[in-house]
Amino acid sequence: MAVVNFYGTGRRKEAVARVFVVPGEGNITINGKSLEEYFPRKTLQIIVKQPLELTNTVGKFDVKAKVHGGGISGQAGAVRLGIARALVQADPSLRPVLKKAGFLTRDPRMVERKKYGLRKSRRRPQWTKR
């Protein structure tokens, strides 16, 4: 018998996550490691679990994610979006709840590029009047 798995792609800053949600007992695996192992910081673990907790599906699905690029915060955001999209694929009735919480919206904020003549994207060199 084929295992029914639901897929969602999440992106945040430079991070890209490919997330598979399978009916199971609530194991979350990211790049072959457990959630606590991959994201030792508690706040990032909370971010990843948010869509599951909001929809009361914590113990009902196993989550398997492959994530690359960006930093740890961007990766956590990407996994969250991927989980939310996969949950909607699994159960379309969850869409309004996740949409209202903003978990189905891709965060468009990206790093602004550095401009020539400036030290960073907006920071100017110090100007001396006299």
From Swiss-Prot:
Q: Does the keyword Ribosomal protein apply?
A: yes
The answer on whether this UniProt entry bears the keyword Zinc-finger reads: no
Note the InterPro entries from the entry: Ribosomal_Su5_D2-typ_SF, Ribosomal_uS9, Ribosomal_uS9_bac/plastid, Ribosomal_uS9_CS, Ribsml_uS5_D2-typ_fold_subgr
Q: Which SUPFAM superfamilies match?
A: Ribosomal protein S5 domain 2-like
Keywords of the record, alphabetical order, are:
Ribonucleoprotein, Ribosomal protein
Molecular function via GO: RNA binding; structural constituent of ribosome
Biological process, per Gene Ontology: translation
Entry GO terms, CC? cytosolic small ribosomal subunit
A Pfam family that this protein carries is Ribosomal_S9
The family database entries (HAMAP family) matched by this protein are listed as:
Ribosomal_uS9_B (MF_00532_B)
**Protein family:** Belongs to the universal ribosomal protein uS9 family.
- Please report the name of this protein according to its UniProt entry: Small ribosomal subunit protein uS9
Q: Which organism is it from?
A: Carboxydothermus hydrogenoformans (strain ATCC BAA-161 / DSM 6008 / Z-2901)
